Amino acid sequence: MVSFASDYIAGAHPAVLKKLVDTNLETLTGYGTDEYCASAAEKIKKACELGADADVYFISGGTQTNQIVISTMLKGYEGVICADTGHINAHEAGAIEYFGVKALPLKGEAGKITAAAVDEYCKTFYGDDNHEHMVFPGMVYISFPTEYGTIYSKKELSDLYEVCKKHDMKLFIDGARLAYGIESKASDVKLRDIATLCDVFYIGGTKCGALCGEAVVFTGGCCPKHFVNLIKKRGALLAKGRLLGVQFDALFTDDLYTEIGRYAIDMAEKLKRIFADKGYRFFLESPTNQQFVILDNKKLKELEKQVSFGFWEKYSDTETVVRFATSWSTTEEDLKYLESII
């Protein structure tokens, strides 16, 4: 069945898979100390225009990455501010709470939180005479793009980062779908901007062409000591770290990572036009690879027998919001088929 259920329904981009096959019989050191991990890290630093004080580590998945970064960067009395719809708050099974970190959710707007809202939260917190009895805000977590496919502007990121510095907090950007954010035609943010407007972020591989894996980037001087030890303690250090290094080495060769993002955006725009031309309504305006369509429940039942897509939320008693996602594996034939059945 043709599927638009997510951007990780297929395996790896052919160029990534070829690199894995071509290097398969090479004997390499373990735990991320191999030459491909080193090469990928240097390519990422170059793409981000970061210096020698930046640090890059590879972790197998997004939830592990969020949990490790957040739990190792915060002190025991600190929590993390996030949107109420943020992945760490809504869809990670309490992973950060499992390690003793409280999520401090703020009401988001289409998945985004504002610098003003964060600033007000912190002012209210420190203005409370009882704040020593409360969880301190120690970090702000955002996603780029958000769970709703929306993106922050460069000014919005800059304002958030300034508020974080004002209140002595770290800014962490979840880049699970980073390729689609930086390559969106509506975005004025590029990889180098991400690298200068936060303390730590990660470059998503799993949802952007890799079999699995994310690349954590500490932008300079704030990487926790003995980070490899901390990754292993949390059960997330691969013995065959080459699996991640080889993939990211391929993704950051000849601009493959951004090419994957551009292609998925092009497919998403075509998908969006197909629905719009047929008179369908959208839940919100998404400039990235995730499109949120409002379906009549009867039509939903018909379509789900013919094509895969993701449930998002109930819209009314008779309508539902569903998500259609594109990726490197989406084809023109997939779109033509979709057009023929909706």
Predicted regions and their residues:
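Catalytic PLP-binding core of fold-type I/II PLP enzymes
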Residues: Y152-S184
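PLP-dependent aminotransferase-class I/II
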Residues: G100-G138, I142-E147, Y152-D159
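Conserved N-terminal alpha-helix of the aminotransferase class I/II PLP-enzyme fold
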Residues: H13-G62, D84-N89, A95
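Active-site C-terminal subdomain of aminotransferase-like
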Residues: E109-A110, F136-P137, S143, I151, ...
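Conserved core of the PLP fold type I
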Residues: A54-L74, L104-G111
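Conserved PLP-anchoring active-site segment centered on the Schiff-base-forming lysine
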Residues: T72-A90, D119
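Conserved C-terminal alpha-helix-loop-beta "cap" of PLP-dependent enzymes
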Residues: K75-Y77, E269, I274-I342
